[in-house]
Amino acid sequence: MQKPRILFITPLPPPVHGSAMVSQYIKECKELQEEFNCDFVNLSTSRNIDEIGKRSIMKYVRFIGAYFITLWKLITNSYALCYLAITCHGLGFLKDAPFVMLCKLFGRKVIIHQHNKGMSSCVDKKPYKWLLPLVYKNTKVILLSWHLYPDIEKVVKKEQIIICPNGIPEITEKEPHFERNNNVPQLLFLSNLIPSKGVYTLLDACKILKDKGCQFVCNFIGGESKEITKEVFEKAVEERGINDAVIYHGPKYGKDKISYFTNVDIFIHPTSNDCFPLTLLEAMQYALPIITTDIGGIADIVQNNHNGYICECENPTALAAAIEDLLADKQKRVEFGMNGYRLFKEKFTLEQFNKNISQIIKDNI
């Protein structure tokens, strides 16, 4: 019997970010390859982090190219289902919406995998108040967490929702070292240098800790952005007088990134705009205690006082207090790290994600 054919219209790396990485995992998923004939169209018009949010001729060319590739695939194939990972607000939504409508025009079933949030900020504005209901009507919508549902509840009914948490590959079958032996505790921030990820909040917290005489080194890893270049970051560090406590290492990948995860003591992600950060799952895999914020679906990942601390968003004082508590209590760091590792193994492996996404596709063709 011929396998059902599925069309995946998703952003693929580069650039490397959460949604693109999940799409890449889906593209490589053996369970899907065994059950279905899978076609992919790259929805991303950016090829590096610097291009995100900027207009260029090449981005228009890529958009038009992706649209006509999608049109050709819909004409020449009979798809049992179209899976789309789209932006739900702003110009990104206006760019992605035509792909959903094209699939609907051909009478195909549609699943939308929602990796972002922000619909509530534009749902009452033109043209979104007309377009959003059109795009999401008669679709199934995959959310990463029920905590994200309030953002889309004006447009999407609860009956349309399917919950599927993200998962990441397991780097090693061996258990990580739960106890680190650094003479000076090492903190790790791993994200692109974007203000909404809490870069300045963490720098301010570092200043508070340094002024108190706390001993630590805060390691920043991630690519530069248009808002925060290396020069801007280093100036911010100098202005706060924390040059001896903060190091920017630039972006790191593969073994280079792993070496930081295996050697630091505390992972910090003071974000103000996230859905379900993969970087937190990475930290849990390496048994790191986490300090983060209650944004998006993070409460499903980090349980306060169990595998980390949840702090108030954009509050350097609260962040500094949480860091100071873990700096002073090595046993608590180990305990939180062990709890996080067990939670990761139970819920957030790529193997579990692949099983979930494959079953969702099967149930909806």
What are these regions (language model features)?
Residues 132-174:
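Donor nucleotide-sugar binding/catalytic pocket of nucleotide-sugar-dependent glycosyltransferases
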